Amino acid sequence: MKRLLENSLETCPIVKRGPYHYFIHPISDGVPLVEPELLRDVSTRVIKMIDTNVDKIVTAEAMGIPIVTAVSIATDIPYVIMRKREYLLEGEVPVHQETGYSKGELYLNGINKGDKVVILDDVISTGGTLVAIIRALKRAGADIKDVVCIIDRGQGKNIVEKETGYKVKTLVKIEVVDGKVKILE
């Protein structure tokens, strides 16, 4: 039996920008509408696959925020958001991020040496964001216990493991074929 996430992916709209086909989905884009049932399905599944004996959950701005909030509320684990804006706080860790479609800076605050963390994000495609997050957390002295992305599209999991040594857990693997999302696993 397919779950809510998989069903919603198979029916989501696809838009083409240049050579790239983007799937538009509530988990990855916050549009057209984020239904509480979908967020509950995703967060419940994430909680079952992560080490909950951690100090903090880390995500990148912006679409990891709804997911990390739901997981945080359900587990009582606080979370940290890697922001796209510099705050100039003591201990802030800047990191350059490059994906297949953008590049820029992320800034990590609120992580102390020895913090046990789970990384949680919405989509992995090129792996660029996760590689940047992992490097920033290692520079800050964090102990990374799990790395999780909801949707796997592309070769990002392999790239992250090759460049960082961390395996990325995902809920669903997809590809866009003939203008539709196809569930691979």
Curated annotation (Swiss-Prot):
It catalyses: IMP + diphosphate = hypoxanthine + 5-phospho-alpha-D-ribose 1-diphosphate; GMP + diphosphate = guanine + 5-phospho-alpha-D-ribose 1-diphosphate. One of its GO terms (molecular function) is guanine phosphoribosyltransferase activity. GO terms for biological process: IMP salvage; purine ribonucleoside salvage. Its EC number is 2.4.2.8. GO terms for cellular component: cytoplasm. It is found in: Cytoplasm. Transmembrane segments: none annotated. InterPro entries: HGPRTase-like, PRibTrfase_dom, PRTase-like, Pur/Pyrimidine_PRTase. It is an enzyme of class 2 (transferase). Its main location: cytoplasm. Keywords: Cytoplasm, Glycosyltransferase, Purine salvage, Transferase. Belongs to the purine/pyrimidine phosphoribosyltransferase family. Archaeal HPRT subfamily. Catalyzes a salvage reaction resulting in the formation of IMP that is energically less costly than de novo synthesis. NCBIfam families: HPT_Archaea (NF040646), PRK02304.1-4 (NF002635). This is Hypoxanthine/guanine phosphoribosyltransferase. It comes from Methanococcus vannielii (strain ATCC 35089 / DSM 1224 / JCM 13029 / OCM 148 / SB).
